[in-house]
A protein has these predicted regions:
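Glycine-rich flavin
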Residues: 235-242, 247-382, 415-419, 425-426, ...
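FAD-site-proximal beta/loop scaffold in flavoenzymes
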Residues: 366-383, 469-549
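N-terminal Rossmann-like FAD-binding beta1-loop-alpha1 element of flavoenzymes
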Residues: 218-246, 395-404
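Core beta-strand elements of the Rossmann-like FAD/NAD(P) dinucleotide-binding domain
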Residues: 217-219, 339-348, 465-474, 512
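Transmembrane helix boundary and interhelical junction motifs in multipass membrane proteins
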Residues: 37-66, 125-132, 153-159
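Glycine-rich dinucleotide-binding loop and its adjacent helix/turn
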Residues: 261, 353-412, 437-441, 491-512
Length: 601
């Protein structure tokens, strides 16, 4: 070190300084406490680093009792001053600097009020200074903030002050391994984990204490919904010999089998065969054409569903040991579910209620018989003029498919590109292919009103400030899907719903009720069949093995594919998401026109 500074970093030097400070403290008791107290307040009020170190010093200098008293009041006063500065002087700066964190804290305060602040003080999920600044922008009263902060920080203060008292007792380097100091460090490390566990247990007991727990349960787990998520959850639970109830009010197999993956891919396959006929000369054939009956095409779609139905049937799952109930579930409390007038008791509940097509409240939509991914499969006549409202995966797949069958298709998308979650060049490629297939892709068009004029139906859209009329015979509404959360007791029970409309879950797919879990479309954030199955494993295992073991749901590598032609597929994030999340990446491009397989196809 320059200027021989290393001589001040030895244990002997530090002990000598400690003795001098201790001697000064004994001779100037009030002055030392006052200066330290004021310094601590300034550090915390100014949101400067060093509060933790000063807490350790307080333990070393003042001992456990007085160190705790001094730090408790100084830290709370400083935190309150920072809170007031944020509220009245730095509101805009804090909002812009910590907006994302502030949203989480505001959400917690909105749900749990002062108890949320108490848990943050007890288990600091955010830095001490950030809580002070962020809380200044919430509506919490100053006196409540002070009291809750002082009580919430007291346990942590005692732990840190105690660690400081142990550090002060080191006389030699071998003292670092003394039981007292090692114990202090162990307490420091375990304190957040222990307090988090205590808080979670307290929250759970506070939530469940108003419900009578059954002396004996009919089932270990009851699964509501027999779609992809519910079937996999039931299968896994039955595999480990749990007693399982599976409840379905409609059809086994859910959306994937009956109105989603299976029928759409069957229809896409038929349309693709027709497109090959139109390209016969590319493959060395004389120009040819197919004659088709759309009614028979739709019959084939239903026949494919029938072939797959046994895989998801009541008989199969009954054979696996699952007790399948056909009827509508009503959750009476965290332990009881009513089905067709019968009440069953269960230790855990897994919600796999799925999602339904979202129909936006566009004026006039109630005057037309619109189609969705649920009702599309009932039509038997090919629409002459078809509007597909929405540029997501479902909208894109159906727009190209019906265009290939011969419908005059207009695809309406409010965003500047179709497949908005994909990279721009991917969207551009699909758009160009759609145009070749005859799809009129209208991006940047906002649907304003459906109008019925005699026998004609027209969608009025806004584009660049002007109204544009798009006539149609049928319209498929495919602007997204909304989680099914109403009508089976969640509102009455108080299960929390997220702002996005899905059921609120933690990283372990647990709701605010410790024995109620969610998987599939009802949980989000992905609405894929394979993701629903993926989540089902976590929801089932976490529910059956709580509180002894739990697994955080892993979404780091999620594959998905949109079955347009060409297909759009990826695994994990793309370039667009990497840029949005400020993730460094390396981009490698390989043109498919250089691929042997692509050329042969």
């Amino acid at each position: 070190f320059t200027f021989d500074l290393q001589q001040y970093l030895t244990l002997e030097s530090m002990k000598q300084q400690q003795q001098q400070i201790a001697q000064f403290y004994q001779q100037n008791l009030a002055a030392t406490i006052g200066v330290f107290f004021l310094g601590y307040v300034v550090v915390t009020a100014a949101s400067l680093p060093g509060a933790a170190v000063m807490t350790l010093i307080a333990g070393a200098l003042f001992g456990l009792l007085w160190g705790t008293v001094i730090v408790s009041f100084a830290s709370t006063i400083g935190a309150t001053l920072a809170f007031l500065v944020s509220r009245f002087l730095l509101r805009d700066w804090v909002q812009s600097k910590f907006g994302d964190k502030l949203a989480l804290i505001n959400e917690g305060i909105e749900k749990e009020g002062e108890f949320y602040l108490f848990t943050l003080r007890l288990i600091p999920a955010f830095p001490f200074f950030l809580i002070n600044l962020a809380m200044g922008l919430t509506p919490i009263r100053t006196i409540k903030y002070y009291v809750v902060s002082q009580v919430g920080m007291l346990a942590g203060t005692i732990v840190y002050v105690f660690a400081g008292t142990q550090l002060a007792q080191i006389d030699s380097l071998s003292g670092i391994l003394s039981p007292g100091l090692l114990g202090a460090f162990v307490i420091l490390g375990l304190f957040p984990l222990i307090t988090k566990k205590i808080v979670n247990v307290f929250k759970a007991s506070r939530l469940l204490r108003k419900y009578k727990r059954p002396k004996k349960y009919d089932y270990n787990v009851a699964v509501i919904g027999a779609g992809s998520a519910g079937l996999v959850a039931s299968y896994i639970a039955a595999t480990v010999k749990a007693k399982v109830a599976l409840i379905e009010k409609h059809k086994m197999g859910g959306d994937c089998l009956n109105t989603g993956c299976v029928p759409s891919k069957a229809l896409i396959r038929s349309a693709k065969m027709l497109s090959y006929a139109k390209r016969a000369e590319e493959f060395g054939f004389n120009k040819g054409s197919f004659e088709f009956d759309f009614d028979k095409v739709m019959d084939r779609v239903q026949s494919v569903i029938k072939k797959i139905e046994p895989h998801d049937s009541i008989e199969r799952y009954t054979g696996l040991g699952v007790n399948v109930y056909e009827g509508e579930a009503k959750i009476l409390d965290p332990y009881r579910i009513s089905i067709n007038g019968e009440t069953i008791t269960t230790r855990n509940i897994i919600l796999a209620s799925g999602a339904s097509p979202f129909v936006p409240p566009i004026p006039g939509v109630d005057k037309i018989n619109y189609l969705t991914s649920d009702t599309l499969w009932d039509i038997r006549e090919l629409p002459k003029r078809l509007i597909v409202l929405g540029g997501g995966p479902i909208g894109c797949e159906m727009a190209q498919t019906f265009a290939r069958f011969g419908s005059d298709v207009s695809q309406i998308e409010m965003a500047p590109q179709i497949l908005i979650r994909e990279d721009q060049e991917v969207s551009d490629l699909v758009t160009e292919r759609f145009k070749k297939d005859g799809v009129n892709v209208l991006t940047g068009y906002k649907a304003k009103e459906f109008v019925v004029e005699g026998d004609d139906k027209v969608l009025i859209c806004e584009f660049e400030g002007k109204d544009v009329r798009v006539p149609f015979d049928e319209v498929i509404v495919a602007v997204g899907r909304r989680a099914n959360t109403k009508g089976f007791g969640l509102e009455e029970l108080g299960v929390e719903i997220s702002k996005g409309g899905t059921i609120e879950v933690d990283p372990y797919l647990q709701t605010n009720f410790p024995n109620i879990y969610v998987c599939g479309d009802a949980a989000g954030p992905y609405q894929f069949t394979h993701t629903a199955s993926h989540q089902a494993w976590y929801a089932t295992v976490n529910s059956l093995f709580r509180p002894f073991k739990k697994f955080r749901a892993d979404y780091s590598v999620i594959p998905w594919c949109t079955f347009t032609d060409p297909e759009v597929a990826r695994v994990g994030i793309n370039e667009k998401e990497a840029q949005e999340k400020n993730i460094s990446y390396e981009l490698t491009e390989f043109a498919m026109d250089e691929s042997d397989r692509a050329l042969t196809d």
